[in-house]
Amino acid sequence: MLSPQTISYKTLLEKAWPIILANASVPLLGLVDTTVIGNIGTAQDLGAIAFGALIFSFVYWGFGFLRMGTTGFAAQADGAGDQEEVRAVLARSLLLAIGLGLFLILLQWPIKQAAFSMLSGSESVEKVAQSYFSIRIWGAPATLCTFALMGLLIGLGNSGQLLIVQLFLNGLNIILDIWFAGFLEWGAQGIALGTVIAEWATVAFASVLIFRELSRREICETAFFPIKKLRDRGPFVKLLSANADIMIRTLILVFSFAYFVNRSSSFGDVSLAANHILLQLISFAAFFLDGYAFVVESVVGSALGSKQNKMFDSAVKKSTILAACTALILAAALWIFGGFIIAGLTDISAVRFEAVKFLPLASAYIFLSFAAFQLDGIFIGASFTREMRHAAMLSIIIFLVACRFLIEPFSMFGLWWAMVLYVVARAAALLLFYPRLRAAVGL
């Protein structure tokens, strides 16, 4: 059990690094898929995977609330020592995940039609991509259940097991993709089938890990899922409300990046390509900052559940210092070595020149983003989701207003300044609600 005395920098780092590795392992899967199809499949297969992966990434990102909502409530229940409620949190989240997953399957035709109406590819690519979609959609319930299961592991502070689950998912997926697409030459359909099988296998694997973990805590004296607690609608309504708030916040975040990319395209193909590269570097930095945010979600939730105010303050202070130092190192590294990194990512001189020109602003974004990541983690751990929704709404308004007044006179520099202002506004908006959070939890 964590305490103010055991919340050391070493402890936080030990909890963060498995999460960072788990996050960083995700792009490896896409790289392997691309390599397999790029060497064995057709151009249509490669294009189909690009389209299909984009659609599912967008859809599943919108359901990220299942992970975040589960983490906060599980951490609080675990901190309070209410292990029966931990199981109830898991059950509610899994029921919601299964329901939403089945809903996606039922609506697969309109989702597919809407998605492909917004994408412009050749007829042959779209035909293969639709086949890919029709197979992968059957993994939706499994993917959403995995979000809930991973959320529980984070809430319980088991970042090591989270890494194991993520490596199992990616490792099995890679093996199946190589087998189906590489050896059997099933192309994009083989990639989709391998992904679906891996997703369902991961649900089973993670469920076994969690069952053993909860059994180790000797909390299975009665039925594993407490039916009596599940009949109480209050906590389920609370979970639905929290998840709705997080979903709105997430969709606003998705919109902000989509808007940034769309405005980038108005400056030409070179500017769009340059900003795409810089956003990939920002995404890489997010793997590290997310690690600390996930840890603070767990520790803050546990501290509030156990009513250890000193533990809350210690966790917030030390994890924020670590995140700030990490962000500074990442930003400095990008500023100093960014030119070499960009040169390795593209040999198009115009794109390289354009990307290097905005390296300082991309570096500033990375450094200043640590506060938004940390505050997100604190608010998720405390289940203060309504305030997260309000903060997201406020910050996107600031971003759009900044774009309105900065882009015309300053062109692409204005767009980047607006983006940097946006990440600062995200943190500032959450800080407005931070005193309310502390007061509500008795700090």
Q: What positions do the PLM features span?
A:
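Alpha-helical transmembrane segments of multi-pass membrane transport proteins
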Residues: K10, S25-V26, F63, L104, ...
